[in-house]
UniProtKB/Swiss-Prot annotation:
GO terms for cellular component: basal part of cell; basolateral part of cell; basolateral plasma membrane; cell surface; cytosol; early endosome; early endosome membrane; late endosome membrane. Keywords: Acetylation, Antiviral defense, Autophagy, Cell membrane, Coiled coil, Cytoplasmic vesicle, Endosome, Lysosome, Membrane, Phosphoprotein, Protein transport, Transmembrane, Transmembrane helix, Transport. It comes from Mus musculus (Mouse). CDD domains: R-SNARE_VAMP8 (cd15868). Changing K24A: Blocks internalization from cell surface. PROSITE patterns: V_SNARE. The lineage of its organism: Eukaryota, Metazoa, Chordata, Craniata, Vertebrata. Belongs to the synaptobrevin family. This is Vesicle-associated membrane protein 8. InterPro entries: Synaptobrevin-like, Synaptobrevin/VAMP, V_SNARE_CC. The gene is Vamp8. One of its GO terms (biological process) is protein transport. SNAREs, soluble N-ethylmaleimide-sensitive factor-attachment protein receptors, are essential proteins for fusion of cellular membranes. SNAREs localized on opposing membranes assemble to form a trans-SNARE complex, an extended, parallel four alpha-helical bundle that drives membrane fusion. VAMP8 is a SNARE involved in autophagy through the direct control of autophagosome membrane fusion with the lysososome membrane via its interaction with the STX17-SNAP29 binary t-SNARE complex. Also required for dense-granule secretion in platelets.
């Protein structure tokens, strides 16, 4: 009878050891996943910082380009207005006879 209870006790111990080993493996996998996730988060944070710096540079550059083309446009408008004004003055002067033809 002692052998039967001893054998049953050994089976229970083996079952418990097997369960403990299974839990140990699961916990090891969980820790590895957590570490991997931490590494991925660090990588993602670095990419985010790089994108932020790049976006600031892009914003500054695009503002400079927009300002440059705005001034170019203003200069062109002023030149066209001056040319039109000169043509109108010449037409008026020819029409009034101030400038002989």
């Amino acid at each position: 009878m002692e052998e039967a209870s001893g054998s049953a006790g050994n089976d229970r111990v083996r079952n418990l050891q097997s369960e403990v080993e299974g839990v140990k493996n699961i916990m090891t996998q969980n820790v590895e996943r957590i570490l991997s996730r931490g590494e991925n988060l660090d990588h993602l944070r670095n990419k985010t910082e790089d994108l932020e710096a790049t976006s600031e540079h892009f914003k500054t550059t695009s503002q400079k380009v927009a300002r440059k083309f705005w001034w170019k446009n203003v200069k062109m408008i002023v030149i066209i207005c001056v040319i039109v004004l000169i043509i109108v003055i010449l037409i008026i002067l020819f029409a009034t006879g101030t400038i002989p033809t």
